[in-house]
């Protein structure tokens, strides 16, 4: 039987209707976060899709020293706390060091381990010790079966609720490719699997001093992943992605999200029909 991770009234499992993890790449300010959260909560409620809000307080791995990193942990967590209080929705955000885990866990429901850091044992240990759900993004450099080692580490440190995320694999320079087999392979580890549809279209460092991306392929990859049978879809969303401070070329425009989700619900239902 497939593992089901429970978060309040949300059940996350590969055999269950998919959940949506969405929000802007980074926290741009309180007003913007509340605006985005309100839109996303209303839309997912309308479509009956379980929803978790995502946004980052620090983009610690920006390509260039000039890249905008975000509000930082103190102000960022303050904003996420207000989003949670205002809309009563679960929150996920990234942690980049062991020292951030305890403080972040006081506010959010899920700690996300970035792909570049997925093998960092001390970080995994610190995240596991908080007792929160730990969501690990598979490194672009890892085979899906290598995530067994990540799972073993987390379990050794006491983590009971683990999510894995597929976000693409390095394919030459400045390019990623999505191997849909990864979703099925990681699911065999008895872990709910999330597909990151927006980071999967990244072109890392593709613009020289920033990351490029091919937004036009987000929907295509999301549909393909949904037909495999996944626990959730992860999408970064913005009302004006072309002017966003980070990952603009990859993010979905807010106005286009509803039509994509309607299609994904249909694919998901067909895939999981008994």
UniProtKB/Swiss-Prot annotation:
Keywords: Cytoplasm, Lipopolysaccharide biosynthesis, Transferase
InterPro entries attached to this UniProt entry: Aldolase_TIM (IPR013785), DAHP1/KDSA (IPR006218), KDO8P_synthase (IPR006269)
Main subcellular location: cytoplasm
Pathway entry: Carbohydrate biosynthesis; 3-deoxy-D-manno-octulosonate biosynthesis; 3-deoxy-D-manno-octulosonate from D-ribulose 5-phosphate: step 2/3; Bacterial outer membrane biogenesis; lipopolysaccharide biosynthesis
Single GO MF descriptor: 3-deoxy-8-phosphooctulonate synthase activity
Gene Ontology biological process terms from the UniProt entry: keto-3-deoxy-D-manno-octulosonic acid biosynthetic process
TM region(s), chain numbering: none
Pfam families per UniProt: DAHP_synth_1
EC number from the UniProt entry: 2.5.1.55
Catalyzed reaction equations: D-arabinose 5-phosphate + phosphoenolpyruvate + H2O = 3-deoxy-alpha-D-manno-2-octulosonate-8-phosphate + phosphate
Family note: Belongs to the KdsA family.
Name of the protein described by the UniProt record: 2-dehydro-3-deoxyphosphooctonate aldolase
Organism: Rickettsia canadensis (strain McKiel)
Gene name of the record: kdsA
């Amino acid at each position: 039987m497939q593992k089901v991770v429970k978060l309040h009234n949300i059940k996350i499992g590969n055999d269950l209707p998919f959940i949506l993890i969405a929000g802007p790449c980074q926290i741009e300010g309180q007003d913007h976060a509340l605006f985005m959260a309100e839109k996303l909560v209303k839309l997912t409620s309308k479509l009956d899709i379980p929803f978790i809000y995502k946004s980052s307080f620090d983009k610690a791995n920006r390509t260039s020293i000039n890249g905008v990193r975000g509000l930082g942990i103190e102000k960022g967590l303050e904003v996420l706390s207000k989003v949670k209080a205002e809309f009563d929705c679960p929150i996920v955000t990234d942690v980049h060091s062991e020292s951030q885990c305890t403080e972040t866990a006081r506010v959010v429901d899920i700690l996300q381990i970035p792909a570049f850091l997925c093998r960092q044992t001390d970080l995994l240990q610190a995240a596991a010790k908080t007792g929160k759900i730990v969501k690990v993004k598979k490194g672009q450099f890892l085979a899906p079966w290598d995530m067994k080692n990540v799972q073993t580490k987390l379990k050794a440190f006491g983590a009971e609720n683990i999510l894995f995320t597929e976000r693409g694999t390095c394919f030459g320079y400045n390019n990623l490719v999505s191997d849909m087999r990864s979703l099925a392979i990681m699911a065999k580890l008895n872990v709910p699997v999330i597909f990151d549809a927006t980071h999967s279209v990244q072109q890392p460092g593709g613009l020289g001093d920033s990351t490029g991306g091919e937004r036009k392929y987000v929907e295509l990859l999301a549909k393909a992943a949904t037909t495999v049978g996944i626990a959730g879809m992860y999408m970064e969303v913005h009302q004006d992605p072309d002017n966003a401070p980070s990952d603009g070329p990859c993010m979905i425009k807010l106005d286009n999200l509803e039509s994509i989700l309607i299609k994904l619900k249909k694919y998901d239902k067909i895939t999981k029909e008994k």
